[in-house]
């Protein structure tokens, strides 16, 4: 249990107690709703899924006309992203559905594999050797946030990367650490990244908002 006190912060666990003057929340799409009142109702987790093929032969790459190692994505609203990996495997990713259960994961494995075969029909016989998914994090205004959450400047976060966390998360982690240690000033960051996180309207309905967005964007993509 995490408690905020006048002296600082106390984290109590079954293994012991930890005290700190400053806290950074860096859990992104895995941030629990009740972890902090400063984040309640302000974040929306969304699943993203990835499959990876066995290494492709040069003949297979030629058959599909694939000639680059540069990551790419398509122009859909519910986009797919993909790249050839250094060992010749092909990585293909996209949204991960709205069911976080194990059964939902298997259903979406089939769905994303179908999408992969639709876009790359020459590789329909390429075995899928890896599949995983996880949560990305969305903010109401679809912009990351870096900075303090409380008026005392003792609770900090770098959060809401909207599926771009591999690059943005690394950069943001360094940025929030520099703010906390006073090696940088808030004004040195773009005001777009340091504005206050706004709450979603009627935040209890966020799962429905996400499902509705998928239906709408899916219809737009089908036009």
Regions found by a protein language model. Give the residues of each.
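Extended alpha-helical regions
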Residues: 1-8, 18, 25, 208-209, ...
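Active-site substrate-recognition segment that forms the wall
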Residues: 3-8, 16-59, 63-153
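C-terminal lid/capping helical subdomain adjacent to the catalytic/cofactor pocket in oxidative enzymes
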Residues: 151-223
């Amino acid at each position: 249990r995490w408690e905020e006190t006048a002296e600082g912060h106390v984290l109590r666990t079954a293994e012991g107690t930890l005290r700190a003057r400053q806290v950074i929340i860096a859990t992104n799409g895995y941030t629990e709703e009740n972890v902090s009142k400063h984040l309640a109702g302000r974040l929306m987790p969304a699943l993203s899924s990835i499959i990876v093929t066995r290494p492709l032969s040069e003949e297979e790459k030629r058959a599909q006309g694939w000639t680059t190692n540069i990551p790419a994505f398509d122009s859909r609203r519910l986009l797919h992203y993909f790249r050839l990996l250094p060992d010749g495997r092909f990585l293909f990713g996209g949204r991960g559905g709205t069911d976080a259960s194990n059964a939902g994961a298997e259903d979406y494995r089939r769905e994303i594999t179908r999408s992969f075969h639709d876009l790359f029909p020459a590789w329909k016989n390429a075995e899928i050797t890896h599949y995983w998914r996880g949560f990305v994090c969305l903010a109401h205004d679809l912009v990351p946030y870096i900075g303090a959450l409380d008026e005392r400047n003792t609770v900090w976060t770098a959060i809401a990367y909207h599926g771009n966390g591999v690059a943005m998360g690394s950069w943001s982690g360094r940025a929030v650490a520099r703010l906390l240690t006073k090696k940088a000033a808030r004004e040195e960051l773009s005001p777009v990244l340091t504005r206050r996180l706004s709450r979603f309207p009627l935040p209890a309905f966020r799962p429905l908002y996400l499902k509705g967005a998928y239906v709408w964007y899916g219809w737009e993509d089908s036009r």
